[in-house]
């Protein structure tokens, strides 16, 4: 792709998200979402393969439908109450429609079907953008309007997302689909705590983005797209492989690592608000995610796929690529638990 065209695409992508996050009028919010959608489409179909074209079509149809629902709900709210502001959403019909539109854009259940297919059909770098940057604009809208939303609908979708994010990843061997189902589960955790403590949602979002960037950075540099290719990384880049495995454990919420922090704080907050049954169910469903992370770690580190080369390690290791920001991301992804008591803002 032409470097100038690529620059224009990324500028449009960033501008669309910033416009949506800083707008207080529904029309400018919708305009920012449209800019965001049209900027990501050329990146998804960069490879010009049938799978990429299929992923682009699915992404366009889902996102365009969600934008249409959002604009329709904003129009209904204006016709009933004469309000175009984002925060003021007194119409229950309009608020429910907007919530459905945001769930479609975030890939939350029951509108989650497009996320694994689109993520699998494109490049690793584009999958990273879809699972991180593309979540910011819809989450910023949800953050502003959650007081007007029905909390029962949000909690039901959150529980369903956590369940599907765990069950959907059990049979997967493609790493991009595993990360997609992990994203669905993380969106469920964020939306569940939003109605009780929005600051915890921001903490969870920050850590989720750091985990995902760390994972995809390693996968991109090792060109690993499946469980089989991941098992061959021990021969080439054992240090990066060890970092990847620790990041996977952290994403699963294993206690000594950073990923345990948001789950611990979220469950504590929900128990404080007398939602013991919901928090217990969420904790049990989180074990599904931890299970397929552990299975991925076992199959990639403790087993070897059949190969014509009987050597377990190469006689000469490849140089680890220079990734100046990866050590910082890795430390945050793994070793942030000791500073948790300093996070008094999230209490």
UniProtKB/Swiss-Prot annotation:
Recorded topology in the membrane: Multi-pass membrane protein
> What Gene Ontology terms describe what this protein does at the molecular function level?
NADH dehydrogenase (ubiquinone) activity
Membrane-spanning residues: 1-21, 25-45, 59-79, 96-116, 123-143, 153-173, 178-198, 200-220, 239-259, 278-298, 325-345
Q: Which GO terms describe its cellular component?
A: mitochondrial inner membrane
Q: InterPro entries from the xrefs?
A: Complex_I_Subunit_2, NADH_DH_su2_C, NADH_UbQ_OxRdtase_chain2, ND/Mrp_TM
Write the Enzyme Commission number(s) for this entry.
7.1.1.2
Biological process per Gene Ontology, one example term: mitochondrial electron transport, NADH to ubiquinone
**Which terms are listed as keywords in the entry?**
Electron transport, Membrane, Mitochondrion, Mitochondrion inner membrane, NAD, Respiratory chain, Translocase, Transmembrane, Transmembrane helix, Transport, Ubiquinone
Q: Tell me which family the UniProt entry assigns to this protein.
A: Belongs to the complex I subunit 2 family.
Q: What does the protein in this record do?
A: Core subunit of the mitochondrial membrane respiratory chain NADH dehydrogenase (Complex I) that is believed to belong to the minimal assembly required for catalysis. Complex I functions in the transfer of electrons from NADH to the respiratory chain. The immediate electron acceptor for the enzyme is believed to be ubiquinone.
What protein name does the entry list?
A: NADH-ubiquinone oxidoreductase chain 2
Q: Which organism is it from?
A: Oryzorictes hova
User: Coding gene?
Assistant: MT-ND2
